[in-house]
Amino acid sequence: MKNVVGIGGDMTLSDQNLKENITIIPNALDKVKSLTGNTFKWKDGYPANATNAGSNDTGIIAQEVEALGLAGITSTRDGYKTVSYKRLIPVMIEAIKELSAKVDALS
């Protein structure tokens, strides 16, 4: 791809003209229900060079996301999994829409 412009901050290139094979995420609610929100304490020294190393935090488990086949999981050189939380937002949007349809059906 040529002439790609990097965008700083939380902006993500998302132009429809750059995409193909666009489909709605199926069974998003089931996928979200399979994930668990957790509280945890980082092990000493992790994440490396982070101000929250050894402190309490909240998050999800990368291996759970990966097992669902969702995008946004990568591995560090050390083999640790990372999660791109912003890649989960489209799944959550579709899950909310599925849940909303269920609520509407009750009316």
Question: What is each model feature region?
Answer:
Residues I89, I93-S107:
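Long amphipathic alpha-helical coiled-coil
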Residues M1-Y85, K102-L106:
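C-terminal intramolecular chaperone/autoprocessing and neck/assembly modules of extracellular spikes
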